[in-house]
């Protein structure tokens, strides 16, 4: 089947190249959706600013001030968008720093303002000695030299270290560019500027995991049981200085390839550290990932023992949910790689049928992976918009949608439940225990009788529809 032109896109026919319906015996290379391309004007894109994706990586660090050099509004989309707990009292979730640029600073320059705010932040947080400074659209347009300011502050304060990220919101087609700039900037400027103590014969960097509701901390229990030292978490529950030591690891394990695969590639090129990609959502994928890591280190028996213990503990609970979710239909509308991380895991481990997928900032390689893993009859959408979501919902009639709150609150008005695939409902979702949590939240969303109230007009005394639909589970 060719690419699909939805009815809502008839006035924007260019959108046809971005939507694919998988059919039998088709060469997916011929029908691969266009991705990582500029949004077509007028399409009500769900994409976000590049600053947001830089903060998704850098903002997770637990010991670092995140200074946003720009108007106060640019600091809105920060710590509250996802929940990144840490084991030091959640420092990164308590504060937002902004230089609060005003019109006069735009006219006359904001470098003095930035310098003042950097000193002020370090004075107010005397125990914090690390900072990342981000440019925004206004400060980039007026040419503020944030690197020069950072060098001046570090010279005046020898005990601090500052990293700058120059990637204003307008400099890419989607937020994905922010990932790339931060990855490459970090390895160019900060990797191999510090050494840490190595305490195990097995060492790795765990790359592309941001500790959403404790993902990193749950997986860390696996690595501890296997005797593997994680040199650096990029960046969930991680520290600024640990990331400076990434060159010391024997292996780079990559979870989210879109946000962090760039630094893994550079570590391989510059230091010869091999890259190993895994999926950590789903029982089958998590077990496969553990086996791959253990095979690299030659500790296969330890890995099999860990997998057996986790299966014995959590598989019966997963099977309970699978029995009750079997045959339900799901749409997955997330950022990029989670499409291909989740599609097969929810189908194989939960018996759910994935009927539509949309990516905000995925690249063509992400669509290659998800289409290869997905089933026939599924819609694949790049940079989907609100009207397309409505039409796709009418076509595939999903029982539940995995997405973020922005789209999630929209579909709730259509009486369709959603599970927060960005910040999670009640995570963690990674690992064996985490996937049981995901199954539980999906079950609760699908079978919650309260959602049936949305279609009931309680003011109508003649309404005969039961307020609570019994036996929905």
From Swiss-Prot:
It comes from the Bacteria. Gene3D superfamilies: Nitrogenase molybdenum iron protein domain. CDD domains: Nitrogenase_VFe_alpha. Its EC number is 1.18.6.1. It catalyses: N2 + 8 reduced [2Fe-2S]-[ferredoxin] + 16 ATP + 16 H2O = H2 + 8 oxidized [2Fe-2S]-[ferredoxin] + 2 NH4(+) + 16 ADP + 16 phosphate + 6 H(+). Keywords: ATP-binding, Iron, Iron-sulfur, Metal-binding, Nitrogen fixation, Nucleotide-binding, Oxidoreductase, Vanadium. This vanadium-iron protein is part of the nitrogenase complex that catalyzes the key enzymatic reactions in nitrogen fixation. The structure of the 7Fe-V-9S-C-homocitryl cluster is assumed to be analogous to the 7Fe-Mo-9S-C-homocitryl cluster. Belongs to the NifD/NifK/NifE/NifN family. Hexamer of two alpha, two beta, and two delta chains. This is Nitrogenase vanadium-iron protein alpha chain. The lineage of its organism: Bacteria, Pseudomonadati, Pseudomonadota, Gammaproteobacteria, Pseudomonadales.
